[in-house]
Curated annotation (Swiss-Prot):
Cofactor(s) needed by this chain: NAD(+); Co(2+); Zn(2+)
Family: Belongs to the sugar phosphate cyclases superfamily. Dehydroquinate synthase family.
Gene name of the encoded protein: aroB
Cofactor note: Binds 1 divalent metal cation per subunit. Can use either Co(2+) or Zn(2+).
Reactions catalysed, as given in the entry: 7-phospho-2-dehydro-3-deoxy-D-arabino-heptonate = 3-dehydroquinate + phosphate
Function, in words: Catalyzes the conversion of 3-deoxy-D-arabino-heptulosonate 7-phosphate (DAHP) to dehydroquinate (DHQ).
Organism, scientific name: Xanthomonas axonopodis pv. citri (strain 306)
UniProt GO MF annotations: 3-dehydroquinate synthase activity; metal ion binding; nucleotide binding
Lyase found in the keyword field: yes
Protein name per the record: 3-dehydroquinate synthase
Pathway participation: Metabolic intermediate biosynthesis; chorismate biosynthesis; chorismate from D-erythrose 4-phosphate and phosphoenolpyruvate: step 2/7
EC number: 4.2.3.4
Enzyme's top EC category: lyase
Pfam family, one: DHQS_C
UniProt keyword Nucleotide-binding, yes or no: yes
Length: 370
């Protein structure tokens, strides 16, 4: 696809403000990349799918702009299965071997897994160094690269070990979407749909109208979707950077979705397990069904959401082989829970999400059982 040369930017306000820049060709802009490195050391963290396409170009761009810059590189295996304490340790070792000081910078070149790992390593190395997010997937551009939530998974659950560490900048080169597999594009669109579902009915309607263009990779439609999604997230993160309240709304479908991901053993390139966006799509439908069962919303709203996700070729049902009891056990470990009670993001219809602090497990089990 061809992309407009116009650039869009979204400012994220707060104690540590930064800018999200959205445009084609940004990875070749060495001056822009290097401007965020305060010292003489940078670590480029990428994965086995992304690095062959873009890592050499990023390193060359940095070297042209800053010949004095020492750039290390770590390439991890692609997929959620790499988001572990062991891989995190490899990133820390890479920083140590580079001789990175407190003015070093970690560049996260990849999707959500790379962004989470790089951000967490940056948060921990010498108690915090800069991280610049270079998202190459739609999901990372609209969600995981923005807001400073970083984490790794453990066998007991997803994102249970992590830190809040806002990036120094988010630089989203939309040219990278050209090499994004169709399945990963659809996964990112699930997170885009989420923004309409939680707070923007007009955006929800726009997504329905533009669904064909988005699935076909239309540059203008994708740029609009990315910018609008980032605007929504930036507004929420600025008001609630540490997820003490409103920011939890961004997790619509995630408690159910994370349970599915964890119970399946996480998706990876080439396997049939749901990836993150697909699991969130199923989770949003489950959250909508639970909302209707609790009398919070109309069943027709649930069907409207399910139909839109289906139109984007996203799953809407729990994969076979996962029991309600096993999924509920995973949900009990969700970070949003308080005092051992399920705390879920539900809704009162399209654009009207809210946090429900004490949801009965029996009601959840009934939804999980179908």
């Amino acid at each position: 696809m061809t992309l407009s040369r116009s650039s869009r930017s979204v400012d994220v306000d707060g104690a540590q403000p930064y800018t999200i820049t959205i445009a084609p060709g940004l990875l070749a802009d060495g001056a822009r990349l290097a401007s965020h490195v305060r010292g003489r050391h940078a670590l480029l963290l990428s994965d086995s799918q992304v690095a062959p396409h873009y890592a050499a170009g990023v390193r060359a761009a940095l070297s042209r702009a800053r010949p004095d810059l020492q750039v290390g590189e770590l390439v991890i295996a692609a997929g959620e299965a790499s988001k572990t304490l062991e891989t995190f340790g490899s990133a820390i070792t890479a920083l140590a071997e580079l001789g990175a000081t407190r003015d070093a910078c970690v560049f996260a070149l990849g999707g959500g897994v790379v962004g989470d790992l790089a951000g967490f390593a940056a948060a921990c190395w010498m108690r915090g160094v800069d991280c610049v997010q270079l998202p190459t997937s739609l999901l990372a551009m609209v969600d995981s690269s923005v807001g400073g939530k970083t984490a790794v998974d453990i066998p007991q659950g997803k994102n249970l070990v992590g830190a809040f560490h806002p990036p120094r900048a988010v630089i989203a080169d939309t040219d990278t979407l050209r090499t994004l597999p169709a399945r990963e594009l659809r996964a990112g669109l699930a997170e885009v749909i989420k923004y309409g579902a939680i707070r923007d009915p007009l955006f929800f309607q726009w997504l329905h109208a533009e669904r064909r263009a988005l699935l076909d990779g239309d540059a203008a439609a994708l740029a609009q979707a990315i910018a609008r999604s980032c605007e929504h997230k930036a507004e929420i993160v600025a008001r609630d950077p540490l997820e003490k309240g409103e920011r939890a709304l961004l997790n619509l479908g995630h408690t159910f979705g994370h349970a599915i991901e964890t119970e399946q053993g996480y998706g990876a390139p080439g396997n049939d397990n749901l990836n993150h966006g697909e699991a969130v799509a199923v989770g949003m439908v489950l959250a909508a069904r639970l909302s209707a069962a609790l009398g919070m919303s109309d069943v027709q709203d649930t069907e409207t959401l399910r139909a839109l996700l289906h139109d984007f070729d996203l799953p809407t049902e729990i994969p076979p082989g996962l029991t309600p009891q096993a999924l509920l056990a995973r949900m009990r470990l969700d970070k949003k829970n308080i005092a051992g009670r399920l705390r879920l993001v539900l809704w009162r219809g399209i654009g009207k999400a809210e946090v429900v602090p004490d949801v009965e497990e029996a009601a959840v089990l009934e939804i999980l059982a179908g």
